[in-house]
UniProtKB/Swiss-Prot annotation:
This is TPR repeat-containing protein TP_0095. TPR repeats lie at residues 1-30, 76-109, 110-143, 144-177, 219-252, 325-358, 428-461, 527-562, 597-630. The keyword Repeat applies. Keywords: Repeat, TPR repeat. The keyword Repeat applies. InterPro entries: CellSynth/LPSAsmb/PSIAsmb (IPR051012), TPR-like_helical_dom_sf (IPR011990), TPR_rpt (IPR019734). PROSITE patterns: TPR, TPR_REGION. Coiled coil: none annotated.
Amino acid sequence: MTSTQARIREAVRAGSVRDYARAIRILEELAASGKAEGCHHPDGGAVYERGAQEEWNEGSSESHAHGGDGTQDAYPEIYLYLARAYHAQRQYARAVAYATVYSRRVPRDGAGWFFLGRSYLALHQGGYAVAALRRSVRENPASLGAQALLGLAYLRSKKPRAARMVFEQALAQYPDNKRLNAGYLNSLFVEAVQHLKRGSADLARQMFTFLINQDVDGVAPRLYLAHAFRSLKHFPEALTQYRAASAFAPHDPALKWYEAAMLVEMGCLSQAAALLSTLGVSIERDQISDRFLVMGAVRKHMEEGAWARAASAAHLYLKTFGGSVEIHLLMAEVHRRAGRVNVALNHYTRAMKIEPKNCYPHYGLMVCLQEARRWQELAKAIRRAEGAGCDAQDCYYYRVITAAHLSNPPEEVLPHLQELARGGKADQLLFNALGVTYVRLGMADLALRWYEKTLLLDAEDEEACVGLIACYEALCDDARAYTQYGAYLSRWRDNRVIRKDFIAFLERTERWSEAADHIELLASGERGGFWGTRLAFARKKAGQYRQAAIIYRALLRQRPDERVLLHNLVYCLDKMGQADAGLRLLRAACNAFGTSVESRLIEGVLCLHTRRINAAIRTLRAVLEQQPGYTAASELLAKAYALASSRA
């Protein structure tokens, strides 16, 4: 066993007892020293994944490659173990980086793709997770863990049919596995809901019936099954299922409205009226209609904030009775509250087509576009609203707010905003518009007050949270800007633009370790892994020399003749206490690609650090012969002479 193999086994043992910090330190030292790289045979050994909860000391057959031409052996499994250790530490972006490197080095090993997919899934990047896990299953079809995780990745990517097929195939191999069966039933449920929404009511009925028979029971399965029966006009069966749903949630009044609607469909008006009276709704028999009752169910769900059920009920109404302004407005509101902006806009537009002069769809559309900050579209919507006869003051209000967010001169917009404020307007939309206008005028101190007013009304207002960042940066208040960036990204973690701004801020304020972490997080969401030199530089500036050296080595594999990368790698090795290794690497690179004054100077420094005083003197003299007057070389040479004389 080589010393490298012994060190790897030591790291594996540390990982097996959850001493991940020690395992990472050992593995990063090996990777930084180049032990993970080298010439490896394409059919080199593989590490086989044995499940997501596999212990470190299982399945650890080594995948190092032996250099048949006398080159140093490579141990790419170092990257795999690093990926697993960082995943265990919940540092998923770094886990992705190392798993990516390993999978490129050993592409036939399903374990690498498995752990890459697992870390992508932890970062909520379902598409990348699916691609990695599909490759894992292809390389190792017998892997139960990879198949289960692939099914989950498909589910999270909103592809229930693909998920169900994966679980079905896995169950054919492992029919008694409870995890696979649970995944299969979950994916079948989501697929059944999709079939119902697309109009395949009979297929949905069969699927929901199967699920209930498999003990996947409760309000949701019964409610969806009832909707399926209703779409098929099987009203008695639908009534039975609505009552079954109510039995699971007896205090949910919305479910009673469905029962009443079915009683009306079946001609039982007296029973429907009696049921409604228990809900506090007094209505004559001849005034009861199924339309009224389904609409009532939609409204009840909305009152309770049950947006998914409200959307389902509204969809049922639309399929049964066709479109109307009222139902499209309700559906738009449901989808707007659920964050599905484009679907909401579609329903507002459909309502406008039914009644072009009805102002309510125009107001709803303007609110939706404003919340989504789609200002160019809002400007056009305002003109349409004016043409439909909407209130002139309301249109003026939206026009001024929109102007503040477009490329209009802020000094021209400000008087209109001030007029609105004097007129009694006191809402967060106006406050934010005043904030952005003052920022553009260079009056961040005034802007700050308006954003703070907004946040008193709504602490979750995203525009105001971003506005505070801009104000603090303009006022050079780095401490508050730093805090606000952190607060914002903890709430809206997917905003890549703000994260890039935060990285620039962290670099400017020399918070290098945190800058590197955020660079890594951004890189995990893009094909290509590391952000190259920027990440390596941040790690180096943070004093994280092992991690920086690993990245510089990866970059040098792509650009082996680039001097800056070489010099930075050697610098990191020196800081790690591996000046000897750095010196050997530098000399080898100079022999291969030629030397330079800077390289010779660094060689002189390394000779001094390794106590090769005579070699340092020769090297530094050569530098001064090539470039007389080089101050750094002169100072180092004087130091070398002093060391030589002290030894004499």
